[in-house]
Amino acid sequence: MIIGIGNDIIEIERIEKAISKEGFKNKIYTQKELENIQKRGNRTETYAGIFSAKEAISKAIGTGVREFSLTDLEILNDDLGKPYVVVSEKLDKILRNKKENYQIEISISHSRKYATAMAIIL
């Protein structure tokens, strides 16, 4: 059973401006995400893709970012580069209220100008 589907698209230039501002990175990205971004070349597209994935997941949850913060979602990559989601204890409780054994699947893509992501919560 599908709990929710979310999609997001963002201009990479917008994220480029945002990450240059004091505090933005720590408000949006976890320490593990920031380390992972550094390992992957510190590319603006990576920041944008992760941001877009978090927004897509919040839409799939159905609440937007009202009951949790974007740092309650962590977007990491497996050994093959496939993105996966780790949720905080707080967000886990919210999701378990919807379905005990939920699963979050995401896909992230980008072009030169845009990053996009899709999320499905099963």
Swiss-Prot record:
Keywords: Cytoplasm, Fatty acid biosynthesis, Fatty acid metabolism, Lipid biosynthesis, Lipid metabolism, Magnesium, Metal-binding, Transferase
Predominant subcellular localization, coarse grouping: cytoplasm
Gene3D superfamilies with a match to the protein in the record: 4'-phosphopantetheinyl transferase domain (3.90.470.20)
EC number, UniProt record: 2.7.8.7
Domain of life of the source: Bacteria
Function recorded in the entry: Transfers the 4'-phosphopantetheine moiety from coenzyme A to a Ser of acyl-carrier-protein.
Family to which this protein belongs: Belongs to the P-Pant transferase superfamily. AcpS family.
Name of this chain's protein: Holo-[acyl-carrier-protein] synthase
Annotated organism of origin: Fusobacterium nucleatum subsp. nucleatum (strain ATCC 25586 / DSM 15643 / BCRC 10681 / CIP 101130 / JCM 8532 / KCTC 2640 / LMG 13131 / VPI 4355)
